[in-house]
């Protein structure tokens, strides 16, 4: 049984490959990105159990990737990998949202133990890992179909839930009504695209209107987007 999906953001290909082989042997699935920009894009899409993030990356640094990721995802565990062993460096990484900090070179057994610990601390059983989608204070469990905004549970119909999940998988991206229709209702749907507007309104009544901060935005003449 797959234990979870781990994103490795590491510019040294040899290190990334070794980590991939070890993690896959342990039962994890692995995705690798070799620079900060690609790593941030992948992490922001969600669906990962944990992120292994090198600090010294081309493009965006690992710390900047983490800082930006934490603006939209406070849940996914992140372990920083770095050759810099000073206390100030560790404090900075932990303060901006890292769950742990591992100094290179490291023993793979220790890293695996830290990964297991981070997953436990995240309060997720390994068989359920990778089912959560988060944005700001909105949290969705795809497996149990539970939706929470802040500390309040929100009940959605099956269609409302599917629409919300689709939008959460494309955060800060403008989605046209046609895209939403084909992905949520199916390519064979025959009907008016206004059904999208109707269901967006249903979701807003439950997830946006009771709160000061609105997450679902109308892009006039185009469609909708989830953004802060």
UniProtKB/Swiss-Prot annotation:
It is found in: Cytoplasm. Signal peptide: none annotated. Residues 130-228 bind DNA. The keyword Cytoplasm applies. The keyword Cytoplasm applies. Coiled coil: none annotated. GO terms for molecular function: phosphorelay response regulator activity; transcription cis-regulatory region binding. Phosphorylated by YkoH. GO terms for biological process: regulation of DNA-templated transcription. Residues 5-119 form the Response regulatory domain. Pfam families: Response_reg, Trans_reg_C. One of its GO terms (cellular component) is protein-DNA complex. Keywords: Cytoplasm, DNA-binding, Phosphoprotein, Transcription, Transcription regulation, Two-component regulatory system. The modification 4-aspartylphosphate is found at residue 54. It comes from the Bacteria. Probable member of the two-component regulatory system YkoH/YkoG. This is Uncharacterized transcriptional regulatory protein YkoG.
